[in-house]
Swiss-Prot record:
This is Argininosuccinate synthase. InterPro entries: Arginosuc_syn_C, Arginosuc_syn_N, Arginosuc_synth, Arginosuc_synth_CS, Arginosuc_synth_type_1_subfam, AS_cat/multimer_dom_body, Rossmann-like_a/b/a_fold. It holds the Pfam family Arginosuc_synth. The lineage of its organism: Bacteria, Bacillati, Cyanobacteriota, Cyanophyceae, Synechococcales. SUPFAM superfamilies: Adenine nucleotide alpha hydrolases-like (SSF52402), Argininosuccinate synthetase, C-terminal domain (SSF69864). Keywords: Amino-acid biosynthesis, Arginine biosynthesis, ATP-binding, Cytoplasm, Ligase, Nucleotide-binding. Pathway: Amino-acid biosynthesis; L-arginine biosynthesis; L-arginine from L-ornithine and carbamoyl phosphate: step 2/3. The keyword ATP-binding applies. It is found in: Cytoplasm.
Length: 401
């Protein structure tokens, strides 16, 4: 008896998910495999991917346009939360997984499947993200994970696929594993596993090299309403269009490349190469506007909770109660994050050079100036410092005694 009768497989067209189709049927006795591929703005033509799944043995090959919900329901909350895992990675890949899992469950319900499946390996983060999201949304559905159990190396998986008539999507000349969506690209494997090998220019697609980037700086203005980016240089754009334009501008100037060592959920360290020009640009601008519009104690607390928020998303806990509670805090603070930020793009840099908020700025020039317009009560500082330093004086006196 097979492990399931009808399975919906999260499908990308890559090695692992392609090999999963014949493997589920031939090795695990699954009667019917239906694939689902998500359009997340990766720019690929998805019809060849759909046909590839059918050629590999899928009974149905479904494609869903998830670009708008990806941006509205996942990217924008990440921008409002200034989400940077370990202070650097803006979660461009991690944000896509709960959305794909949610859609996978919906498709499974629609077609009457008794299981879902994915092609994640046993040492990556995505297996955790898919499994936890599916468990939170549909604990009754079985989750099949052939790539976690088959013990095949990448080369062996490619060979298995070729025996089943599946052409290999990579070659010895291009050994990299690449994941991409509207928010960015992640590149790993191959020569990049040597930590001292610089990523070759050929692995990048969204960003110019420093040499190729324009020498002339470009100043842009990003406008925000309630924490959401809504316009660039005064031109209002829908959320998807704004991300695309941010990608174009930042990428043209070579901003948005990351080469980092990352702590995976499963406990190992890995080298990750990312291109996330637009997302990093928008987070930087958003952070700056918050520094102008949020009270100091709110800002300090938010910075702490941002790290927690990013860790939850990275670790696959998008649908957790704690993540939901943190969303409430983030959303409440964004009421005041209205205004614009001016950024100078040049040769891989994005430097904030201006910020303003007509309605919510907490910067009072008469308080901050050292000029003749200064109306800060300097005499009040002496009493404040005395009270503020009282615990230190009492502690010092007790030690002397």
């Amino acid at each position: 008896m097979g492990r399931a009768k009808k399975v919906v497989l999260a499908y990308s067209g890559g090695v692992d998910t392609s090999v999963c189709i014949p493997y589920l049927k031939h090795e695990w006795g699954v009667e019917e495999v239906i694939t689902f591929a998500a359009d997340l703005g990766q720019g690929d033509e998805l019809d060849p991917i759909r046909l590839k799944a059918l050629d590999a043995g899928a009974s149905q090959s479904l494609v869903g346009d998830l670009i708008e919900p990806f941006v509205e329901q996942f990217a924008l909350p990440a921008i409002r939360a200034n989400a940077l895992y370990e202070g650097r990675y803006p979660l461009s890949t991690a944000l896509a997984r709960p959305l794909i899992a949610r859609q996978l469950v919906e498709v499974a319900r629609e077609v009457g499947a008794d299981a879902v499946a994915h092609g994640c390996t046993g040492k990556g983060n995505d297996q955790v993200r898919f499994d936890l999201a599916i468990a939170a949304l549909a604990p009754d559905l079985k989750v099949l994970t052939p790539a976690r159990e088959w013990s095949m190396s990448r080369e062996e998986a490619i060979a298995y696929g070729e025996r089943c008539g599946i052409p290999a999507p990579v070659s010895k000349k291009s050994p990299y594993s690449i994941d991409l969506n509207l928010l960015g690209r992640s590149i790993e494997a191959g020569p990049l596993e040597d930590l001292m090998v610089a990523p070759p220019e050929e692995v990048f697609a969204m960003t110019s090299s420093i040499d190729a980037a324009p020498s002339q700086a470009q100043d842009i203005e990003i406008s925000f309403e309630a924490g959401n980016p809504v316009a660039i240089d005064g031109v209002r754009l829908d959320s998807v269009g704004l991300i695309k334009e941010a990608n174009r501008l930042a990428g043209r100037h070579g901003f948005g490349r990351l080469d980092i060592i990352e702590n995976r959920v499963v406990g190992i360290k890995s080298r990750e190469i990312y291109e996330t020009p637009g997302l990093l640009l928008l987070i930087r601008a958003h952070q700056e506007l918050e520094s102008l519009t949020l009270a100091a104690d709110v800002l300090r607390m938010k910075r702490q909770l941002e790290m927690q928020w990013a860790e939850l998303v990275y670790q696959g806990l998008w649908f957790s109660p704690l993540k939901d509670a943190l969303d409430g805090f983030m959303d409440r603070t964004q009421t005041y994050v209205n205004g614009l930020v001016r950024i100078r793009l040049q040769k891989g840099n994005a430097m904030v050079i201006g910020r303003s908020s007509d309605t919510n700025s907490l910067y009072i020039s008469e308080m901050a100036t050292y000029g003749s317009e200064d109306n800060f009560d300097h005499r009040a500082a002496e009493g404040f410092i005395y009270i503020w330093g009282l615990p230190s004086r009492l502690w010092a006196a007790a030690r002397r005694g």
